[in-house]
Amino acid sequence: MVKLRLKRCGRKQRAVYRIVAIDVRSRREGKDLQKVGFYDPIKNQTYLNVPAILYFLEKGAQPTETVQDILKKAEVFKELRLNQPKFN
């Protein structure tokens, strides 16, 4: 199973996180499948590769709680619902 998870980067007392698609069994700093975003909590900046995130979410990837909060703020889940077909 694949998760969208934060991967810590940066230096001491100055954490910066990458949002990555990674296998559940891998460690936090393990090999990721793809880098799909960036989050800097100090400067409060985010960069999201929305097409890549939507691809992994459509394939069944589960975001962690923190990543889910970041995606909600960016309104990525609204785009996910728009891409899904409607059934009558």
Swiss-Prot record:
Main location: plastid
GO biological process: translation
Gene induction: Transcribed and spliced in green leaves.
Disulfide bonds, paired cysteine numbers: none
Gene Ontology terms, MF aspect: structural constituent of ribosome
InterPro entries reported for this sequence: Ribosomal_bS16, Ribosomal_bS16_CS, Ribosomal_bS16_dom_sf
UniProt keyword annotations, A-Z: Chloroplast, Plastid, Ribonucleoprotein, Ribosomal protein
One of the Pfam families matching this protein, by short name: Ribosomal_S16
Annotated localization: Plastid, Chloroplast
Cellular component terms per the entry's GO annotation: chloroplast; small ribosomal subunit
Record family assignment: Belongs to the bacterial ribosomal protein bS16 family.
Protein name (Swiss-Prot/TrEMBL): Small ribosomal subunit protein bS16c
